[in-house]
């Protein structure tokens, strides 16, 4: 699974080789429909807030006023589960993590969740 972050550039933290196509959708069902029409590796935007406390993350996400992109507010383990589901269900080949709040460090978050995703994918294989 490929992982990118939305920073000044669009930065990949994994080692993908196929050309990537970034896209956004309001939900997983719409994302799966959109993915069918894309050539190359489909990389889905996911706006995120991660906190050790699920309720705190949900409140921050609600306050952030996320637009029409798929969003997640919760724990790091929950985010890893969502990303694995996105990949295994064929919704996307990877994701772009977009912090919903400025205090969220996109790179640190992506590195932490990537390790958990890799572990879950090894277990699923």
Ranges and model annotations:
Residues 1-125:
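C-terminal amphipathic alpha-helical "assembly" element
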């Amino acid at each position: 699974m490929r992982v990118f972050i939305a920073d000044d550039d669009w930065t990949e933290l994994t080692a993908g080789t196929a050309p990537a196509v970034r896209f956004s959708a309001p939900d997983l069902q719409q994302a799966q429909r959109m993915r069918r029409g894309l050539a190359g590796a489909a990389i889905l935007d996911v706006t995120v807030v991660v906190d050790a406390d699920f309720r705190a993350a949900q409140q921050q996400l609600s306050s952030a006023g996320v637009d029409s992109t798929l969003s997640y507010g919760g724990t790091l383990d929950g985010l890893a589960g969502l990303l694995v589901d996105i990949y295994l269900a064929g919704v996307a080949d990877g994701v772009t993590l977009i912090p919903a709040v400025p205090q969220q460090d996109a790179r640190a978050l992506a590195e932490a969740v990537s390790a958990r995703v890799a572990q879950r994918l090894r277990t699923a294989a």
